[in-house]
């Protein structure tokens, strides 16, 4: 199977989360019974890609063996890349990261572009925490692009990329094979994996959480049982596919927050076969098995957890990826929208489609909001009044929506770009100013 981004993929996918996969684009390309034979089949080179330490416990160890036409070391020296100057990966006080205000923040979507711009040059960092160099925390980027990557390839050595398309499909060709991803789906590209992005629909826009720390995993289900939330079988990994092209290509690397470029005389997407458990994958958010109350109260939003990156503190994650999909609300005598809240964690939200049930106006697809540690947030005035008077004896379906949240245990620090951009809604605080005083000590 060879790569061709000019049309939709025809190959199927490998099902499962972090499975030990084995796949080959040519029969017999995978060595039998060993990883690095003296001579690999078809004159290929054996190369291991390690996503965790060699000595990580077996249940957490991630690596894959690639059998490729040329090793990844074959390229010219890197030099600084002049494009994509809006990326940040260190979130201490700096010229890129000003003091973090406690204000609630909300943004309109990035405008679609006029100048031809590909996925790499369309990246901008909105916020983040921690440090790429120290391998902890994350960066939250937006992307807006209108041109496919042409004879150039990209990888991040800083972290794995959780990509959430909002507008436009992405045809992602990786070293491991191809992922076709549309809005309502997500893709995860592991640290170090080289890839190119084609835009079959022209304009494309979306969100990225770049995870600097421990790899994303499925959460434990506890008393939910053995099934529910995001089921492992619904995660899809590409089958091996390759291209054998020579010419003048460009390889873009992201390391310690900086972009670097190198000339390369061939396509690096030349892996003919691979096996292992460190590989790209995608997931359709519409397959999420939503859990909720069928008696009273609105449970904590942890019931909407899709993926997590664990910390060294049990029960506390460095990153939670949470979605708010279509669902039935049936709790009686209950305020059904998300309640008013102050959180020790920090919450960055985005909207893929429709409307969010806690905000009647202002939060639109492609937009974003940030509620940092202990910043009060919750439904706007109009939503509160309507939900307080609604008939809760009848179930109600929240439909035609897909919101999500990147939640982190440490402060999410907005960049100078995020605080200075014209997309920042200066009047966001007004959505709560109309909340009425209902208190009456004489009436219970």
Curated annotation (Swiss-Prot):
Fe cation binds at residues 341, 347, 377. Homogentisate binds at residues 356, 377. Its cofactor is Fe cation. The keyword Oxidoreductase applies. GO terms for molecular function: homogentisate 1,2-dioxygenase activity; iron ion binding. Its EC number is 1.13.11.5. PANTHER family: HOMOGENTISATE 1,2-DIOXYGENASE. This is Homogentisate 1,2-dioxygenase.
